[in-house]
Amino acid sequence: MIRQAAERDAAGVLAIYEPIVRDTPISFEMEPPTEEQMAARIARSHEWLVIERGRHIVGYAYAAPFHQRAAYRWSVEISIYLAQDARGSGLGRKLLSELLDSVSRRGFVNAFAGIALPNAVSVRLFESFGFEKVAQQENVGFKLGAWHDVGWWQRQLRAPTSPPPDISPRAPVVLG
């Protein structure tokens, strides 16, 4: 089941995120956030979804502000993470599809994904949803003894209008 995340989901989300932070360059964080910090992130995101098997969170995806300055408010940065045993199962596709549908319905115009490279699985996933590579920052992050590039992918969610639409608030709903 896919549903809106709540602050109470922070521990389940951290169970997925902590090993990614500790053991991979996928996230450029050097230390995992605390449960309280993760709960605050969930509360302030534009959209945050979790996918469960039974009552166990096996993945999450969120749309965060692309940048803090006001003119960027119609663009979101998308991130998706799955538990090791959920990868390759199609759950990531379902989760990303729901997230993109939700932010599009709310009025966002662009979605961006920053991907630490190399990461062929993430690149294939985002490109299969119509994201196109628009930039690459070389040697932008140093983690685990090596320099890493970040590629940026973009998908237009709707045609831009002038003036742009208002962004509708996040609504707590249970999805597919």
List PLM regions with ranges:
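Conserved GNAT-fold acetyl-CoA-binding loop/helix
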Residues: 14-40
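Acetyl-CoA-dependent GNAT
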Residues: 30-85, 96-97, 102, 156-158
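Conserved GNAT acetyl-CoA-binding A-motif
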Residues: 103-115
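Glycine-rich acetyl-CoA-binding "A-motif" of GNAT/NAT acetyltransferases
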Residues: 56-60, 121, 147
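Acidic/histidine-enriched, glycine/proline-rich intrinsically disordered or flexible terminal extensions
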Residues: 158-176
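Conserved catalytic-core motifs of GNAT/GCN5-like acyltransferases
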Residues: 62, 112-115, 127, 132-149, ...
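Conserved acetyl-CoA-binding loop-helix of GNAT-fold acetyltransferases
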Residues: 88-101, 121-128
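A short beta-loop-alpha structural element at the N-terminal edge
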Residues: 1-13
